[in-house]
């Protein structure tokens, strides 16, 4: 019996393991495979338990694997009402097997503790007071009597009397700590300057006008964790690491530039603190100034990152949870002193993963340079680079996505945004939002459920399934990336510096992937030179790009030289570094290294500047390298792209991500972001790929074969993509006899019409009440049909697809009439009647009306938040729609190329974008079958079998 029982257990385990293959999870999407997709779920403190549970049920039905419980704001945040509502959320998460994240602020920005940060724990700024002393003069003072005293330093002025000589600095701080100081300048005939350093409370934040916690002082961070984090653990600790996944921070700022941990950072780095303090607030003479100021900026960022974000993450780690979130990244705020201490990467390296926010219309289908907040296009690469170069678990990187885009956000747009994130390596998507108050709210829609008044809710499941399947294959395993781009946000604080957005885009257009690699990560021992590769965690970079920067650290450029001499490929563009950002090293030291790499007289050009003895090559390209120029240089150096196009037109909108998955197989994600409807036929070439290419269809959950050829150590394959259709290609060990992938040339064995079902109960979407503040632009339409399927068409090996055509535009251009349009600040600060403005746009043929902040003035990010509300009549039906600043109102929307399908009452999948088909094989039964297609009108509904 014992032997039989043991054997039986082994057999059951084997069956379970077979059932839990990557392919099985991809097809079936169990809840655990969905945990990288999950929305913000808002809590205000005025919702009933019944309301919260009802909307959480919709979160689960929508195919999510997680949600973030966010105070928006909760009227009792950190009070009993807050914990009561979190308890309701936690019970629902357990019931639905969802992971739950906890928002760490009453609204945003994080680390303001609902505006209740005590002065003693608030962020600090360094203040300097200088006293000029003539030769032989004496300083008398007692600066340490001030509780905010930091340091007392003296230094000799240069001959011009404008700057302090770095090697003359004298530390008078120990004297000051003992009491009154009386100090006479040396008898050298030179003027001296005595500098008193102290701190003051940092200004209130730009968002919210609140004080924030000092992230550079351990006692302040300890108070913050004690006040915000520990009470949650005290109540819900048993769920930590199980149902509760961790905490989410939102848009913290870095108003402070000094804290009690700063000097420890200087000491750990072996950097003298005195010249750095002086350079930060005053001026050092000669080359020491940029180097010392840079070192202060780096130490500041490191201190804030280690103390605040490292402190939070370590607290979370000890309780088996994670710390995630995002800063403000758009418009280069990721290198802004007040938003991320000058370099977001140095702060967020201490979090559990990289993260960004993508909101308003920062991303627009078919556009890279948007009017709002540019540049934004490469912020996803910023997030994934943090995860890649700092070795975050499974290369997870997150994005809070779609916030304030407006209720007229379409599902094809959502897919397009998701493809952009995923191809850049961002694989945890947090949609914004499920709001229990909706539709009686205007707070940054879209609301995907909208209180039951959003007919497109069924499409959310289609989108969630799609992006969850992408994340399943594109997280874990190893990232395959040929290029590293050296990066330092703080180098921009002390001289000319070009951030890497344009270069990254050019590389992606040439089908080369890259990671942004901070100077300090490149310099440290974790990044190793192995022949012609840079090895970092799982990364194997074959080429290194040096940024167009006026200054660079000596250690970074010295390692660039070592990489070149070991056989690596080095690319500069625009300008080569001239200044040293390392104290004690000079421009002459930088010049010697630069000349070793690029030669003494490097000029921008196409050919290599130098070739090393071990095959290393250096290039110096134009200020804005084209994809063609980058591809030529890298190709000449023997660095292959992620993917080559042998035939077919990308239009500059086809990009690729390559990984090795958890089972050791190569995976390509080919993101086709062309927005027209034209199908494109490609022949691709995958360098160094091994195995049989299979297309894993993330939209339909099926695996198919494509024509392919083995070419030496590479693989070529043919792939046709519809407009906006992207593809996962996985290289299997052997030919598994997969069915052929369908194209427009494929012909079905049989086509069965699906007839309207006259006996079906009509489905009518509820109409939003008159007091609704956010109204869907879609009225909704449901097709209910019936189809009879002969048994022989369901034979083994046959595939059956539900196929349909979309009906197109709603309404007639002549039936739309604007009744009233109002633009008003939601805090009552002002309003304007803009009926005439909107009416004129509509008469001119426009169907999209932007919410314009210029009408009332002010910046939508920091001023009064305003809402545009339009009441209109279309084809005899009245409706009201609204959108906040930066979003758009769509009147008379077109039917989206999207559908959700049910067969015999069971959810069967759906599609977003072409091709308009769903694999329904396993849902069909011989004989009569019912079919439901929503939420847009369809025609020519049919079942095609292959």
Q: How should each PLM-predicted stretch be described?
A:
Residues 1-6:
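Bacterial N-terminal signal peptides that target proteins for export
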Residues 10-18:
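Hydrophobic h-region of N-terminal signal peptides that target proteins for export
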Residues 20-35, 50:
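N-terminal carbohydrate-binding accessory modules
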Residues 33-38, 48-53, 66-67, 77-115, ...:
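Carbohydrate-binding surfaces of carbohydrate-active enzymes
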Residues 69-187, 196-222:
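Acidic/aromatic-lined carbohydrate-recognition and catalytic surfaces
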Residues 202-204, 735-737, 936-942:
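Short acidic/polar inter-strand loop motif in beta-rich domains
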Residues 809-813, 826-844, 858, 862, ...:
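Beta-strand-rich ligand-recognition modules
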Residues 812-895:
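Extracellular, modular beta-sheet/disulfide-rich ectodomains of secreted and cell-surface proteins
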């Amino acid at each position: 019996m014992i032997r039989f029982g043991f054997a039986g257990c082994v057999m059951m385990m084997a069956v379970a393991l077979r059932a839990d293959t990557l392919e099985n999870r991809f097809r079936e999407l169990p809840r655990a495979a969905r945990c990288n997709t999950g929305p913000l779920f808002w809590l205000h403190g005025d919702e009933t338990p019944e309301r919260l549970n009802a909307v959480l049920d919709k979160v689960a039905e929508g195919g999510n694997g997680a949600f973030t419980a966010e105070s928006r704001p909760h009227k009792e945040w950190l009070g009993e009402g807050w914990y009561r509502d979190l308890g309701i959320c936690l019970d629902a998460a357990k019931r639905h097997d969802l992971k739950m994240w906890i928002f760490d602020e009453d609204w945003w920005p994080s680390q303001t503790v609902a505006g209740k940060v005590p002065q003693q724990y608030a962020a600090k700024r360094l203040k300097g007071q200088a006293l000029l002393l003539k030769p032989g003069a004496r300083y008398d003072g007692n600066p340490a009597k001030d509780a905010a005293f930091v340091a007392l330093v003296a230094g000799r002025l240069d001959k011009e009397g404008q700057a302090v000589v770095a090697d003359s600095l004298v530390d008078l701080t120990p004297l000051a700590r003992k009491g009154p100081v009386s100090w006479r300048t040396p008898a050298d005939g030179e003027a001296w300057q005595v500098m008193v350093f102290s701190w003051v409370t940092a200004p209130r934040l730009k968002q919210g006008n609140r004080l924030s916690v000092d992230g550079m002082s351990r006692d302040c961070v300890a108070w913050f964790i004690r006040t915000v984090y520990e009470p949650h653990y005290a109540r819900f600790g048993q769920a930590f690491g199980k149902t509760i996944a961790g905490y989410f921070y939102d848009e913290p700022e870095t108003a402070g530039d000094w804290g009690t941990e700063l000097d420890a950072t200087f000491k750990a780095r072996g950097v003298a603190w005195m010249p750095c303090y002086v350079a930060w607030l005053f001026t050092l003479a000669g080359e020491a100034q940029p180097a010392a100021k840079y070192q202060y900026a780096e130490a500041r960022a490191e201190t804030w990152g280690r103390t605040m974000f490292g402190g939070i993450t370590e607290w979370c780690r000890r309780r088996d949870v994670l710390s995630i979130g995002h800063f403000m990244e758009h418009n280069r705020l990721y290198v802004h002193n007040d938003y991320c201490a000058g370099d977001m990467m140095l702060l967020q390296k201490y979090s559990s993963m990289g993260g960004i926010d993508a909101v308003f219309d920062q991303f627009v289908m078919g556009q890279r340079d948007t009017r709002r907040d540019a540049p934004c296009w490469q912020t996803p690469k910023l997030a994934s680079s943090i995860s890649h170069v700092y070795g975050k678990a499974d290369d997870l990187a997150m994005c809070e996505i779609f916030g304030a885009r407006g209720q007229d956000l379409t599902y094809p747009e959502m897919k397009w945004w998701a493809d952009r994130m995923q191809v850049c390596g961002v694989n945890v998507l947090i949609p914004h939002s499920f709001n229990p108050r909706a539709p009686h709210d205007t707070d940054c829609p879209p609301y995907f459920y909208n209180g039951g008044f959003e007919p497109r809710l069924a499409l959310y499941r289609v989108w969630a399934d799609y992006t969850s399947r992408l994340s399943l294959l594109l997280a874990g395993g190893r990232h395959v990336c040929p290029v590293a781009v050296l990066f330092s946000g703080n180098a921009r604080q002390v001289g000319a510096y070009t951030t890497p957005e344009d270069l990254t885009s050019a590389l992606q257009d040439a089908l080369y992937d890259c990671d942004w690699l901070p100077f300090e990560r490149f310099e440290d021992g974790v990044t190793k030179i192995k022949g012609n590769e840079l090895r970092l965690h799982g990364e194997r970079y074959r080429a290194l790009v040096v940024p167009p920067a006026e200054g660079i650290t000596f250690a970074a450029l010295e390692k660039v030289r070592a990489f070149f001499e070991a056989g690596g490929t080095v690319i500069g563009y625009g300008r080569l570094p001239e200044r040293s950002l390392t104290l004690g090293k000079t421009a002459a030291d930088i010049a010697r290294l630069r000349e070793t790499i690029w030669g003494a007289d490097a000029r921008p050009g196409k050919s290599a500047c130098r070739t090393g003895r071990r095959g290393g090559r250096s290039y110096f390209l134009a200020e804005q390298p084209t994809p063609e120029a980058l591809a030529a240089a890298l190709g000449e150096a023997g660095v292959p792209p992620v993917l080559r196009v042998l035939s077919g037109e990308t239009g500059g909108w086809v990009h690729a991500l390559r990984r090795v998955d958890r089972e050791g197989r190569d995976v390509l994600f080919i993101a086709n972001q062309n927005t027209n409807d034209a199908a494109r036929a490609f022949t691709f070439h995958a360098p160094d790929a091994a195995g049989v290419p299979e297309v894993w269809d993330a939209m339909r959950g099926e695996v198919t074969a494509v024509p392919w050829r083995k070419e030496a150590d590479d693989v070529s394959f043919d792939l046709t993509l519809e407009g906006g259709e992207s593809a996962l290609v996985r290289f299997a060990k052997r030919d598994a006899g997969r069915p052929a992938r369908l194209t427009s040339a494929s012909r079905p064995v049989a086509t069965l019409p699906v007839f309207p079902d006259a006996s079906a109960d009509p489905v009518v979407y509820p109409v939003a009440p008159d007091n609704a503040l956010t109204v869907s632009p879609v009225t909704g339409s449901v097709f209910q049909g019936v189809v009879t399927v002969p048994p022989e068409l369901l034979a083994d090996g046959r595939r059956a697809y539900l196929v349909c055509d979309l009906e197109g535009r709603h309404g007639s251009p002549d039936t739309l009439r604007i009744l009233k349009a109002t633009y008003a600040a939601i805090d009552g600060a002002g309003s304007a009647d803009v009926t005439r403005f909107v009416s004129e746009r509509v008469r001119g043929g426009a169907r999209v009306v932007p919410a314009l902040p210029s009408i009332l003035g002010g910046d939508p990010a920091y001023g009064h938040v305003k809402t545009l509300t339009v009441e209109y009549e279309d084809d005899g039906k009245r409706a009201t729609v609204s959108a906040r600043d930066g979003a758009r109102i769509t009147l008379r929307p077109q039917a989206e190329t999207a559908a959700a399908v049910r067969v015999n009452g069971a959810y069967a999948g759906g599609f977003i974008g072409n091709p308009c088909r769903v694999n329904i094989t396993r849902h069909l039964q011989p004989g009569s079958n019912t079919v439901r297609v929503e939420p847009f009108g369809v025609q020519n509904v049919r079942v095609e079998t292959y």
